[in-house]
């Protein structure tokens, strides 16, 4: 097998099947040297499970990769001994994991919100003076997301699917999407200058299936799959990690993405629906 055929990208656009051996070849409005990818990980291992191949593919095309880890991992202990220091254990495992995928430590952002209760951190509110999550005097998922979206100015973003059963994943999905629009507007100027363009957003399946079928398939050499498995295995404190490794290995060197499209409300789009020409007159 040649090097070219080891990498395959297939994007479905309506009835059209677009195929290439690079991400650029199948991507929408590729921005060349300006491309920057941002991965949103509700918990430290989510992005590795859902996008460990994609991260390596981005490195192959010299695309900077940034990762936001939203929660502090404090509820991820599997033994009594881990209970007091699991957050620090998982932080070190995260650095080891992303190092295996080629992501530099300085590109990993820790938001530090309490694990398993991210719903308590929705929105934005005035921060207590001693809150380490405070940014410009405020705290909350939308506050932090808006800050980092403006700081990084990504061209494409990747996060777990909205259909995941984990409440933290659902909250992150919702809060991140509205933060994209905050980041593009003039609201909260202390968090930085607005981004010029809202980035493209893609869903990754981590535990649950996509709400609708994905439209991008990525195939890599087995060597990239082995690197992904190595990165997953770095989370040694998570005793269930072995079963996840088995699932990923059996699935082979493939990952899938589903593009999200935002359709803003336009009242004029419904005008013709209510015109007489579309209906039979009602007779009493």
Regions found by a protein language model. Name each.
Residues 35-36, 107, 199-200, 216, ...:
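A generic secondary-structure signal marking the coil-to-beta-strand transition
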Residues 203-260:
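A conserved mid-domain beta-alpha-beta active-site/ligand-binding segment of alpha/beta enzyme cores
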Residues 184-212:
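Short, flexible loop segments at boundaries between secondary-structure elements
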Residues 242-284:
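Short, active-site-adjacent segments that bind or coordinate small-molecule cofactors and metal centers
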Residues 1-189, 274-283:
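Active-site beta-strand->loop->alpha-helix modules in alpha/beta enzyme cores, enriched
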Residues 110, 192, 243-244:
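Sparse recognition of residues in long alpha-helices and their boundaries
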Residues 164, 193-195, 249:
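A short beta-turn/loop motif at secondary-structure boundaries
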């Amino acid at each position: 097998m040649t090097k070219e055929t080891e990498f395959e990208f297939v994007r479905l656009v309506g009835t059209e099947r677009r195929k290439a051996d690079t991400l650029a070849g199948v991507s929408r409005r590729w921005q060349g040297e300006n491309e920057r990818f941002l991965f949103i990980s509700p918990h430290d291992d989510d992005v590795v499970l859902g996008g460990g191949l994609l991260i390596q593919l981005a490195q192959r095309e010299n695309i900077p990769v940034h990762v936001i880890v939203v929660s502090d991992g404090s509820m991820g202990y599997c033994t009594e001994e881990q209970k007091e220091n699991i957050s620090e254990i998982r932080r070190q495992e995260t650095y080891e994991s992303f190092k295996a995928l080629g992501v530099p430590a300085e590109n990993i952002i820790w938001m530090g919100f309490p694990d398993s209760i991210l719903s308590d951190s929705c929105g934005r509110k005035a921060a207590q003076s001693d809150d380490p999550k405070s940014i410009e005097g405020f705290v909350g998922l939308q506050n932090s997301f808006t800050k980092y979206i403006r700081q990084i100015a990504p061209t494409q973003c990747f996060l777990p699917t909205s259909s995941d059963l984990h409440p933290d994943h659902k909250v992150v999905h919702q809060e991140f999407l509205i933060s994209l629009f905050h980041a593009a507007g003039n609201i909260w100027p202390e968090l930085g200058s607005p981004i010029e363009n809202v980035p493209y957003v893609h869903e990754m399946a981590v535990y649950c299936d996509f709400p609708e079928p994905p439209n991008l398939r990525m195939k890599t050499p087995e060597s990239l799959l082995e690197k992904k498995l190595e990165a997953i295995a770095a989370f040694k404190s998570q005793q269930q990690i072995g079963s996840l490794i088995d699932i990923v290995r059996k699935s082979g060197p493939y990952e899938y993405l589903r593009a999200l499209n935002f359709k803003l409300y336009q009242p004029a789009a419904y005008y013709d629906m209510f015109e007489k020409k579309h209906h039979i007159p009602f007779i009493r």
